[in-house]
């Protein structure tokens, strides 16, 4: 569990399917604040309902962004994340 005096660590997830959702859940379990988005609005709604994500969108100040999109969308998603983020994009 995260130390309550430590700053909250923040991450982005782009693509909240099986892989992205699993990463998000793992991060949330250890106390990270996770912002994310999926191309499917229904997936976004479900991710909030099931507490997979804390928030829908993109946190430009997150320390890391995980790109978990289908292969054909990786380049565009990574380019957008790199342009909008000050953190690591993987």
Where are the predicted features?
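A broadly tuned preference for mixed-charge, low-complexity surface segments
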Residues: 1-2, 90
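NAD(P)+-binding Rossmann beta1-loop-alpha1 motif at the extreme N-terminus of oxidoreductases
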Residues: 2-56
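Generic enzyme active-site microenvironment
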Residues: 36, 89-90
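Rossmann-like NAD(P)-binding element
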Residues: 58-89
């Amino acid at each position: 569990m995260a130390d309550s005096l430590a700053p909250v660590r923040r991450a982005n997830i782009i693509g909240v399917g099986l892989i992205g959702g699993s990463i998000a859940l793992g991060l949330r379990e250890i106390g990270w604040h996770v912002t994310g988005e999926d191309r499917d609005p229904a997936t976004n709604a479900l991710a909030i309902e099931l507490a997979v994500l804390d928030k829908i969108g993109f946190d430009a100040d997150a320390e890391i962004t995980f790109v978990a999109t289908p292969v054909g969308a990786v380049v565009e998603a990574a380019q957008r994340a790199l342009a909008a983020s000050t953190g690591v994009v993987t």
